[in-house]
């Protein structure tokens, strides 16, 4: 196993522990708690894949961070922070909408790279809006936290989420996954619309109604893709 992979996991575990202690003091805002919950799932998946104990890795990560901080001057820290690009966290959904459990009458699931696409194929003739919470850097989608499809009544009928065991995805991966979800929902004569933030950062091209501009041929192809259940 690559040593960098192990040490990266150890540092991530320790930093998550620090963030958790911060949240335990009720100091974290909603986006902070969002990321904390998602990162916990990711660390569990990575730990299982690597065969590493999280508690042991956290202790090792603490030692690594302490060694780095011992050598870090305040001036170097200021320069590092100044050189970092500005990261923004955008939220379409409330914490309740993100954490709410939902069920599917006719479940369909597809894995596309490191993203899992789920939808209820029993939903027909509904108006559906896609909402997402994600981070943006350099005016582009950087990391998808969670995307969900809601009916006008507020029911959840679809979802795109990162796989905890396969971290890392591009904005193009997210765009393709959204296309698959839209295609599957439109196959049952649902009308799918996209939130303004998703229009701006994930699609950049939509009609006035907020619906992504997908060619009919592409829509049919994406819908057929969802026919096979994983």
From Swiss-Prot:
One of its GO terms (cellular component) is host cell nucleus. Residues 1-73 are annotated as: RNA-binding and homodimerization. Transmembrane segments: none annotated. A motif (Nuclear export signal) lies at residues 137-146. The keyword Nucleotidyltransferase does not apply. One of its GO terms (biological process) is symbiont-mediated suppression of host PKR/eIFalpha signaling. HAMAP family: INFV_NS1. Belongs to the influenza A viruses NS1 family. The dsRNA-binding region is required for suppression of RNA silencing. Homodimer. Interacts with host TRIM25 (via coiled coil); this interaction specifically inhibits TRIM25 multimerization and TRIM25-mediated RIGI CARD ubiquitination. Interacts with human EIF2AK2/PKR, CPSF4, IVNS1ABP and PABPN1. Inhibits post-transcriptional processing of cellular pre-mRNA, by binding and inhibiting two cellular proteins that are required for the 3'-end processing of cellular pre-mRNAs: the 30 kDa cleavage and polyadenylation specificity factor/CPSF4 and the poly(A)-binding protein 2/PABPN1. In turn, unprocessed 3' end pre-mRNAs accumulate in the host nucleus and are no longer exported to the cytoplasm. Cellular protein synthesis is thereby shut off very early after virus infection. This is Non-structural protein 1. The lineage of its organism: Viruses, Riboviria, Orthornavirae, Negarnaviricota, Polyploviricotina. The gene is NS.
